[in-house]
Amino acid sequence: MSEEPAPKRRGATAFMRSSARDSGRSTARFDPHTAHAARICNFWLGGKDHFPADREVGEEVMRLRPQIVAGVRANRCFLRRVVRHLASRGVRQFLDIGTGIPVLGSTHEIAQEADPRSRVVYVDNDSMVLAHARALLASGPEGSCDYLDADLHDTGYLLREASRTLDFSQPVAVLLLAVLQLIPDDGNPGGLVTELANALAPASYIAISHMTADFAPGPVAAATAAYNAAAAVPVTARTHAQITAMFGGLSPLAPGVVPITVWRPDIADSLPQPADLYGGVARTVARRW
């Protein structure tokens, strides 16, 4: 993208500051007694925003599959590499769906290192994540970042609200990192990806990371069962073929859909243990209306 697209439906001064918009539609009810994915991941990342229920599940999963911590950290490294690579291709707008509790090295920080004018919209539907949004939203004055309380299942609403900050007539990178595993097969995760892709301009991108049991079927199955027995939203591990199919008719960039630790790795991201996730990035060609 050679030029910064004009803001839509907001004055220029609105982009000089960050904001958190609560739709009042879909925020998950706060329940500290039931383990939640965002808080469990925060525990695995060494954060402080979790409760005993989250730690209990997190510790049991770690006992059954110790590599989970390396995998969660590898997913953050994957995020960083994806955003940097797409920024190098000229992308200046990012839609990060299922962002989770804010951590250092978030999407807007990485994108605005490449170009301070970059715009980012974070999407989640968890009340604790929403409560932390203002701490996350510290955009530089030349760019913008916003937080949207929305559910991936309602792609129409999500895209309409995101268009307050992002110009969908220009390239946008949609990040779906470790979020589609929270959607069961009957929720049609691949169909949701297609709906998002169809709304994007040519030269936009879809990035996906997703858990798998391909590398250690027994331990991952046991860890998944323990997690699903206690967590608010269960997860589904999928095969390489199933995850690749989520890209629909889009062609992933080289090296394809691969273990996330080998997707354009940096030396600093080298990990001694494999991560139980595949990842890939695909480019849109043309709108499909």
Give the role of each language-model region.
Residues 1-150, 155-156, 160-168, 276:
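Rossmann-like AdoMet
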Residues 146-148, 172-176, 192-193, 199-211:
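Conserved beta-strand signature within the Rossmann-like core of class I S-adenosyl-L-methionine
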Residues 152-153, 162-190, 196:
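A short SAM/SAH-binding and catalytic strip from SAM-dependent methyltransferases
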Residues 167, 201, 248:
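Short conserved AdoMet
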Residues 179-182, 211-215:
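Short "lid" loop at the C-terminus of a central beta-strand within the Rossmann-like core
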Residues 217-232:
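Short, glycine-/aromatic-enriched active-site segment of Class I SAM-dependent methyltransferases
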